Amino acid sequence: MSVSAFNRRWAAVILEALTRHGVRHVCIAPGSRSTPLTLAAAENPAFIHHTHFDERGLGHLALGLAKVSQQPVAVIVTSGTAVANLYPALIEAGLTGEKLILLTADRPPELIDCGANQAIRQAGMFASHPSQTLSLPRPTQDIPARWLVSTIDNALAMLHAGALHINCPFAEPLYGDMNDTGLVWQQRLGDWWQDEKPWLREARRLASDKQRDWFFWRQKRGVVVAGRMSAEEGKKVAQWAQTLGWPLIGDVLSQTGQPLPCADLWLGNAKAVTELQQAQIVVQLGSSLTGKRLLQWQATCEPEEYWVIDNIEGRLDPAHHRGRRLVAKIADWLELHPAEKRKPWCVEIPRLAELAWQRVVAQRDTFGEAQLAHRIRDYLPEQGQLFVGNSLVVRLIDALSQLPAGYPVYSNRGASGIDGLLSTAAGVQRASAKSTLAIVGDLSALYDLNALALLRQVSAPFVLIVVNNNGGQIFSLLPTPQSKRERFYLMPQNVHFDHAAAMFNLRYHRPENWEELESALAGAWRTPAATVIELVVNDTDGAQTLQQLLAQVSHL
């Protein structure tokens, strides 16, 4: 009997089972223990293969692929700390709902806890963060193939959102020519190999329940809060709110067009808060809200009913309002709860939104971080997409810009970490094949610097804007101790990214004014390659501009 040959047949069943559940993208890191899985994936023509040498980046690459494709994405890594490097992407997927299938190769049980090389306790290592966990036994012909395939099918059928961790121990030898070992075992699955359906088909449908009293609530004074959703849903939500005559507070990830722009500015005005207090119902569609003032208002508002609609399970309401948590796809829920044409009930908020926008426009000529956030709409590629980093940059865009309705916007706003942002953006581009603008801060770029290797393989123009404000300037917005701020919070690195771009053979520009930036962008959008554009800005201007605008708008 050939152990290596049977390992590969066992792995082939696993990988083929994944294809029956919509898996098309497989992300693979190098490793020896994962050889059976890697070869099975490489030999399966149903897969698009992606490779990366860094498992942390690989997990985020898969996350980006899943965001756009809306399909589960598989990840294959070897044993040991390679598995642990998937933790950040797994956590993010659990909070934002992307489906990741993590296939982690492992040593067999007799090599665990005995000093064997590259052997750690992998089973259950991700604690409660995966939505589903499956620890497979060592491959053996004593276990029928139908058990293996039905076990995979069952786990995937139960996966509504988040990650499925499948731990796969393999004994040596891992290499060798294929022979007939296990062929009969494999053939007992019959014509399943030629079919396209799962071996075990389980029905688990996410159904939207109609709120029978909606006809009553839609006649009341309401507020719509729009969080993370798809571009198509964003346009529908904007129209729905407009028909109802309800003010729409749109997050940067809502893709609603933010009809009342600069919400995180005007929500700091007491007149706006007073008017919003008249709302009898708040309907929040989508989660992961960004703006600080929005979150503060959400925490203190007390409508008669607060509804949260999202296809991700869980409460999703840190303020713990009295109301309803409705698990449904936003588009489906809107269809079941049509709007009734009514006149807008808010008067003060549209006025404040317009005045806030005028204050922002008045500062757009200065070459700086806040002004870039405001101008970002002008720099979006036609029929493209935007990826927004975390920390200060996403807050500035949320507060100061107005993105087009229905324009795709992506970000990692679940755990909101700065790790893996470039890798995620690379996955977003690969899954869509669209022109992509990504914008991150300098520390975020440093954190995921080796992901620049992924940007050598893009299928359309890709522009990475690195806003270099020399450190974590978001801490300038927080009451951090002045004497300790620079060393322990901001951590300026005093670096530039020209050498990093050159190392990976990427185009690079460092514009010093808006005309130079626009010229660099014009050239980048004509080239199906990646371009790094570094904006070196005054360290504190972005945070200070936001604070100044907040003060101005609060007194309107």
Swiss-Prot record:
Gene3D superfamilies: 3.40.50.970, TPP-binding domain (3.40.50.1220). Transmembrane segments: none annotated. It comes from the Bacteria. Binds 1 thiamine pyrophosphate per subunit. Keywords: Magnesium, Manganese, Menaquinone biosynthesis, Metal-binding, Thiamine pyrophosphate, Transferase. Its EC number is 2.2.1.9. The keyword Magnesium applies. One of its GO terms (molecular function) is thiamine pyrophosphate binding. It catalyses: isochorismate + 2-oxoglutarate + H(+) = 5-enolpyruvoyl-6-hydroxy-2-succinyl-cyclohex-3-ene-1-carboxylate + CO2. GO terms for biological process: menaquinone biosynthetic process. It is an enzyme of class 2 (transferase). Pfam families: TPP_enzyme_C, TPP_enzyme_M_2, TPP_enzyme_N. Its cofactor is Mg(2+); Mn(2+); thiamine diphosphate. SUPFAM superfamilies: Thiamin diphosphate-binding fold (THDP-binding). Pathway: Quinol/quinone metabolism; 1,4-dihydroxy-2-naphthoate biosynthesis; 1,4-dihydroxy-2-naphthoate from chorismate: step 2/7; Quinol/quinone metabolism; menaquinone biosynthesis. Homodimer. PANTHER family: 2-SUCCINYL-5-ENOLPYRUVYL-6-HYDROXY-3-CYCLOHEXENE-1-CARBOXYLATE SYNTHASE, PROTEIN PHYLLO, CHLOROPLASTIC. Catalyzes the thiamine diphosphate-dependent decarboxylation of 2-oxoglutarate and the subsequent addition of the resulting succinic semialdehyde-thiamine pyrophosphate anion to isochorismate to yield 2-succinyl-5-enolpyruvyl-6-hydroxy-3-cyclohexene-1-carboxylate (SEPHCHC). Belongs to the TPP enzyme family. MenD subfamily. This is 2-succinyl-5-enolpyruvyl-6-hydroxy-3-cyclohexene-1-carboxylate synthase. It comes from Salmonella heidelberg (strain SL476).
